[in-house]
């Protein structure tokens, strides 16, 4: 592995990747993003994980997508990514879009895995500590849990932006009915939903019926939960 102290990103990295504006914003994202769901946890080879981040960055991939439960073990992907940043990317934080999510099971008890204000506020603080970041560029509600009112979740996401813990907000895997409520509330609050994530592949095209047209109606970009993640606008 290349010595981290000697790592310098290639000079032409931004010539290697097309970028698109995301939602109703001035933010551009690369056509391909790197998700850290697997291969970056505590059970994985840290040197290999580091090399994958470097390779991605050298090829114009600036968007790195995390979640608090990514690993395995849960939380370890965020911790490892934070270490990779400290050891290799000092001075390059402003060239990266780093996103994270919360809402799936993360810790024991009734507060460790839903879309409530209690869970989301605790989760983003934990995620910021694990990564060593001051803020996330994008923070998602990882799922609609079927119980928490969407209004509570959305108000929490908006407050997260107001508190400076995230620059933009998004939702992941929301059914159309709940997604519409979220889009409407965010737009009225002046913090429009930037992006939605969906399971979408040649084997799973259910979102084409309602979710994707709905995102287009509200000018919300979407990413495919596939490997790699591809941005659509």
PLM features per residue range, with description:
Residues 1-96:
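N-terminal binding-site loop/beta-alpha segment at the start of enzyme catalytic domains
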Residues 22, 34, 64, 81, ...:
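Conserved, mostly hydrophobic/aromatic
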Residues 28-32, 60-62, 92-96, 133-137, ...:
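Short, well-ordered coil/turn segments that N-cap beta-strands
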Residues 54, 105-210:
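Glycine/proline-rich, positively charged
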Residues 81, 179-182, 215, 233:
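Hydrophobic packing residues within well-ordered alpha-helices of enzyme cores
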Residues 207-219:
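Histidine/acidic residue-rich metal-binding segments in metalloenzymes
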Residues 223-229:
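Conserved small/polar residues in nucleotide/adenosyl-binding loops
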